[in-house]
From Swiss-Prot:
This is Uncharacterized protein YdaV. One of its GO terms (molecular function) is ATP binding. Keywords: Coiled coil. Signal peptide: none annotated. It comes from the Bacteria. It comes from Escherichia coli (strain K12). The keyword Coiled coil applies. One of its GO terms (biological process) is DNA replication. Residues 33-57 form a coiled coil. Pfam families: IstB_IS21.
Length: 248
């Protein structure tokens, strides 16, 4: 193996590199520092991918459902000012999540585009190499119960769920509203906000009903780091949506 400390390898790199390319290092010390930095970046990327895959394996599906994998801001249809505002808020949320942490809740009737914009946020983050899970509360509870059946405590699943970069909890308020479900939601929001990881919520409930369901403490935590509540106050748009290959 060539000894880079002799300087021969560095000189060879300089000769072989295109004239318009500047090497990120000029000395042996800089080369070693560059290698360490690149190695750390790669390790972080692998760890993120592993976290995503572990949660997906437990849920037995990918982070974003096939129906929403092509959702983006550009193909979100705007027909009124409310939708225009929701789109603007979703874009702003995505911008903040690219470099930091924020929370959000989308509230409205079924079919009003909550999942589309949440998936658009998630898809943008996935392209940036971040980890994203959009999951219903019912699926969270099913995965927990399955872990109990396997003789596990469910702690491993909760820990993995709380380590992805963005977790979006869907269909809050549709569940049976048992004490166990409330405790699980509290644990998830508590852990994620305490570790500065973002939480999204999708619900048919209004703000007061959500506060009654989850409690004032959790709703207050959702306002951390500029958290937003966005209302989707219009009728379902699903009758106007046609999936490729499906006749309307």
């Amino acid at each position: 193996m060539k000894n880079i400390a002799t300087g021969d390898v560095l000189e060879r790199i300089r000769r072989l590199a295109p004239s318009h390319v500047t090497a990120p290092f000029k000395t042996v010390a800089e080369w070693r520092e560059w290698q360490l930095s690149e190695g750390q970046k790669r390790c972080e990327e692998i760890n993120r991918q592993n976290r995503q895959l572990r949660v997906e394996k437990i849920l037995n599906r990918s982070g974003i459902q096939p129906l929403h994998r092509k959702c983006s801001f550009s193909n979100y249809q705007v027909q009124n000012e409310g939708q225009r505002y929701a789109l603007s808020q979703a874009k702003s949320i995505a911008d903040e999540l690219m470099t930091g942490c924020t929370n959000f809740a989308f509230s409205g009737k079924p079919g009003t585009g909550k999942n589309h914009l949440a998936a658009a946020i998630g898809n943008r983050l996935l392209k940036d190499g971040q980890t994203v899970i959009v999951v219903t509360v019912a699926d969270v509870m099913s995965a927990l119960h399955a872990s109990y059946d396997d003789g596990q405590s469910g702690e491993k699943f909760l820990r993995e769920l709380c380590e992805v970069d963005l977790l979006v909890l869907d269909e809050i308020g549709i569940q049976r509203e048992t004490k166990n479900e409330q405790v699980v939601l509290h644990q998830i929001v508590d852990r994620r906000t305490a570790s500065m990881r973002s939480v999204g919520m999708l619900t048919n409930l209004n703000y007061e009903a959500m506060k009654t369901l989850l409690g004032e403490r959790i709703m207050d935590r959702m306002t951390m780091n500029g958290g937003r509540w966005v209302n989707f106050n219009w009728e379902s748009w699903r009758p106007n949506v046609v999936q490729p290959g499906i006749a309307k």
